[in-house]
Amino acid sequence: MEFSGTHQAFRNRWAKTDDEMCKHSMSFHLHKTLRKEFFASYLYLLEQIPLVKLYALTCEYIKGEKQFYYRAQNFYKDVPPSEEGMMGDFVEISDIDLEGSRQFLKKFVGPGKAGTKCALDCGCGIGRVSKGVLFPVFESMEMLDMMEEFILHAHECYLGDYADRVESYYLYNLQEFIPPRKKYDVIWMQWVACHLTDKDLMEFLMRAKESLRPNGVIIIKDNMARQGCKLDPIDSSIIRHLDIMNGIIQRAGLNILDVEKQEGFPEAIVPVWMIAMR
């Protein structure tokens, strides 16, 4: 197909730039500048030729998954373990975000719905969502994050008395985590699906499906692109259009129960959507 040759040309040119020019250059600034300009060119190509698949962007174009995930982990090393760190420049919308999550969760938990025994918070950070949304509903929690500093701060400081109700902390990258079978009433994934490639997100959702208790649900809350997809090469986050996300969910064998946009955020912020599935 037409776009295949173009995509291969981009890959070949970047490999030469990265392996020959940048490897021998003493200028880290030059290296970063070249990367930024090259990513910008590739994203322009994606917009012009929508048949280019996001999987190629995240898994092939960035010279393999290890580099893609290393960049995200390296980015979060500089993020402070605080609400400000978790919310970036938008800590003022934290309460709005939590209230929207609480109202969405109510639709799926209670008599005749998902139980309240145990929930898993994926990409939990310091536990902002666990503390503000999940602990008030569930008897116990399990929390997962790739950053040890965040988990330690959650347990030792941020969660307070709630920490006594945490069954397990998992220091894992989500793409490598195998959740226990039939364990959770709710699996909450907020601002973490954006850090997985299409393939790894689909495969994690397949594993997560097997870890749900009867009537259990998986909830993804994440930034959604207004059109196509966008990659931030600094922190390796992918903003997908809602249709792209829905396609990944369906390929994982899950049924979408409800989709709702988070209201009350400033117009300048990328739209945030909540998706419930089982």
From Swiss-Prot:
Entry's Gene Ontology BP terms: N-terminal protein amino acid methylation
UniProt key word Chloroplast: no
Signal peptide: none
Subcellular location: Nucleus
SUPFAM superfamilies referenced in this protein's UniProt entry, alphabetically: S-adenosyl-L-methionine-dependent methyltransferases (SSF53335)
Entry keyword set: Methyltransferase, Nucleus, S-adenosyl-L-methionine, Transferase
MF terms in GO: N-terminal protein N-methyltransferase activity
Binding site for S-adenosyl-L-methionine: 123, 128, 145, 174-175, 190, 195
Gene Ontology, cellular component aspect: cytoplasm; nucleus
Catalytic activity: N-terminal L-alanyl-L-prolyl-L-lysyl-[protein] + S-adenosyl-L-methionine = N-terminal N-methyl-L-alanyl-L-prolyl-L-lysyl-[protein] + S-adenosyl-L-homocysteine + H(+); N-terminal L-prolyl-L-prolyl-L-lysyl-[protein] + S-adenosyl-L-methionine = N-terminal N-methyl-L-prolyl-L-prolyl-L-lysyl-[protein] + S-adenosyl-L-homocysteine + H(+); N-terminal L-seryl-L-prolyl-L-lysyl-[protein] + S-adenosyl-L-methionine = N-terminal N-methyl-L-seryl-L-prolyl-L-lysyl-[protein] + S-adenosyl-L-homocysteine + H(+)
EC number: 2.1.1.299
Keyword flag Methyltransferase: yes
Pfam families: Methyltransf_PK
Function: Alpha N-methyltransferase that methylates the N-terminus of target proteins containing the N-terminal motif [Ala/Pro/Ser]-Pro-Lys when the initiator Met is cleaved. Specifically catalyzes monomethylation of exposed alpha-amino group of Ala or Ser residue in the [Ala/Ser]-Pro-Lys motif and Pro in the Pro-Pro-Lys motif. Predominantly functions as a mono-methyltransferase but is also able to di-/tri-methylate the GPKRIA peptide and di-methylate the PPKRIA peptide (in vitro). May activate NTMT1 by priming its substrates for trimethylation.
Family as reported in the entry's similarity comment: Belongs to the methyltransferase superfamily. NTM1 family.
Stated name of the protein: N-terminal Xaa-Pro-Lys N-methyltransferase 2
Organism: Danio rerio (Zebrafish)
